[in-house]
């Protein structure tokens, strides 16, 4: 009798995706982050669901409802901090996942890559709206500053901002709609992740050397299910250490002060995972220019497949490109640091140099390095 997992319509899909999936035999731990992102999404949806049972999306009670969750709900503090720090783990995994794709040339799977860029935008939008919900000082002012950027769009800008706010300032209508969007978006992310996997399984996975691996495939289960399980354990360990030992390490102290439209915090800044983009936004002394640079800082990823002109897919045998890649990583870390600093000398100029370098590496230096490496191959 044929195994049910190979015949049953539903089980067959699961089988072909997670059990009998032919997988390259040499993929390293850098390929674990896809499944870790899946785990993060499940954690966020579950903790978020339980938080939504106790949260109220009204400006007068939002802050106290979060306090109530932490003080009065059974294990509410655990659920709240799992959700807040789970977002940080989500972004760490996201950045490493994208970084791996850039290093090993996974962006040549154009459909998979573009869905991935769309996923990145959606997750960033979800995280931004979630940050507004506790209705602390940084929630309110972060929402005000970031939504106000829409006013830089010529002609329709002001109307667009007021339409987003549901009034003439960030208020009750804004909070309610942000809660609604924050609830629905993770399910859209889950649907997009399925499409992401669908396109990936059309081509099969890439591997560290970037060569065709059809001659050497192994079944996903048990080899990579075990490997993923180890990743799950490590992720949960790090998350629990963060939640149980220093839950506020990555948060902002200002968010423990209820939102006050009459009192602006001295330094308005987003969560740490947006600081690199925030630094790029601030490095241009023009509102519209800054907004364009902000969007392009992420959208530039969609251009990467078209800028690839190397004869090799992976960077593993391309030392010049490797140097530029790690320069890009260092540059992003610099931008993250600058995004959290006040707007004064020398941070302004450092941010501007780092922003120029970020775009230069991706748009100019990497394609030039690839051309040089192609020439060196002929020698």
From Swiss-Prot:
Entry similarity comment: Belongs to the cytochrome b family.
Recorded superkingdom: Eukaryota
Keyword Ligase: no
Binding site for heme b b566: 97, 196
Main location: mitochondrion
Role played: Component of the ubiquinol-cytochrome c reductase complex (complex III or cytochrome b-c1 complex) that is part of the mitochondrial respiratory chain. The b-c1 complex mediates electron transfer from ubiquinol to cytochrome c. Contributes to the generation of a proton gradient across the mitochondrial membrane that is then used for ATP synthesis.
Any GO BP: mitochondrial electron transport, ubiquinol to cytochrome c
Location of this chain's protein in the cell: Mitochondrion inner membrane
Required co-factors: heme b
Topology versus the membrane: Multi-pass membrane protein
This protein's UniProt keywords: Electron transport, Heme, Iron, Membrane, Metal-binding, Mitochondrion, Mitochondrion inner membrane, Respiratory chain, Transmembrane, Transmembrane helix, Transport, Ubiquinone
Annotated positions binding heme b b562: 83, 182
Note on how the cofactor is bound: Binds 2 heme b groups non-covalently.
Taxonomic path: Eukaryota, Metazoa, Chordata, Craniata, Vertebrata
Name of protein: Cytochrome b
Coiled coil: none
Pfam families referenced in this protein's UniProt entry, alphabetically: Cytochrom_B_C, Cytochrome_B
